[in-house]
Regions:
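An exposed, glycine/acidic-rich loop-and-rim segment of catalytic or binding clefts
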Residues: 1-319
Length: 319
């Protein structure tokens, strides 16, 4: 179907609708997902992405809702790193640390965009100049979203640079599979990972990988998110896996997130105005990876561009 494009003071909104009537809405401000409307087990279509009903509020958003994060998703400890023997200092926007790319990351930028010939996808493009938020190199990032007839949203991320740099983008959508009816504490979650990254009280990795065995972090088998959830802020933890599954018994909706990236961060919105109203599953390179030689490094250069995918598969099943 032909994408529907509406223009607002805040940005351009692109709706991709499939043959069943399910649809996603994307916006060029932050290349973000602002709505994803899919059926429940009874066939009722509802929005499962938690955002703002007034799109103008995204301009004031402090929680990265639905946006592409960059240049570096998650935290860089001390807002500094060494790359190829040179030390770089990036913007510290969370105490002494850099979080989600600094004060004016990709989430706060208007991206150019074009729709594909099939009518089921949109490509967003942004260019980040050398020195942006302290990061080296000029980077051009393209985010390709495609919405399928079987309710799969695929995101391909492609990044190029003119000199060695770091690039670690992700999408920061907040999901509530019940359509916003209640919290996500009764959602069931399964994460295919044996380990998670141990962090300090600023969520900076210590360098140690911890086993999930006999901990609140263990989601290798289906478990309700609220069953062992740490209080008061819930989960904000990166797993060493690339697949997660969510099931909402109330609606029967399911979500499967798969990526080509080495980690996936579980965040239960504990620092949002309404804690635990939603959850984020953010595929990414591990936080603070340039400061830990044993971690996979998100280094790119002119001969080695960035190329990764994330898929969000929505479905239904009976409890």
């Amino acid at each position: 179907m032909t994408p529907q494009i509406s223009h607002t003071k805040f940005g351009d909104i692109i709706r991709l609708c499939n043959s069943s009537g399910a649809f996603v809405e994307l916006c060029n401000y932050g290349a973000r997902i602002i709505r994803c409307c899919v059926p429940d087990v009874r066939g009722k279509i509802d929005n499962v992405v938690v955002g703002y009903s007034d799109v103008g509020l995204y301009d004031q958003d402090e929680y990265y809702r639905g946006a592409i994060i960059g240049r570096f998703a998650n935290r860089i400890g001390g807002a500094r790193f060494n790359l190829d023997g040179k030390e770089y200092h990036v913007t510290a926007n969370e105490g002494r640390n850099c979080n989600h790319g600094g004060k004016n990351g990709f989430n706060r930028k208007s991206w150019s965009f074009s729709t594909n010939s099939e009518g089921n996808g949109v490509s967003f493009v942004i260019t980040s100049l050398d020195g942006d938020e302290g990061f080296p190199g000029k980077v051009t990032l393209r985010a390709d979203y495609v919405w399928s007839d079987d309710n799969r949203l695929t995101l391909h991320l492609y990044g190029e640079t003119d000199r060695p740099t770091l690039l670690n983008p992700t999408n920061h959508a907040y999901f509530n599979l019940s359509g916003g009816k209640g919290t996500i504490e009764n959602h069931l979650l399964k994460i295919k990972a044996e380990q998670y990254l141990e962090t300090d009280n600023e969520y900076i990795p210590t360098g140690r990988l911890s086993s999930v065995e006999k901990t609140a972090m263990d989601f290798r088998q289906w478990k309700s998110i609220g069953e062992d959830m740490p209080k008061p802020y819930g989960y904000n933890v990166c797993y060493t896996g690339s697949e997660a599954l969510v099931f909402d018994p109330f609606s029967g909706r399911t979500l499967r997130v798969v990526s080509s990236l080495p980690g996936i961060l579980l965040y239960t919105a504990g620092y949002c105005p309404t804690p635990f109203e939603s959850l984020c599953l953010e595929p990414q390179y591990w936080p603070d990876c340039p400061n830990h030689p044993s971690f996979p490094l998100c280094r790119i250069d002119p001969a080695h561009p960035y190329s990764h995918f994330i898929t969000y598969d929505f479905g239904v099943r009976k409890g």
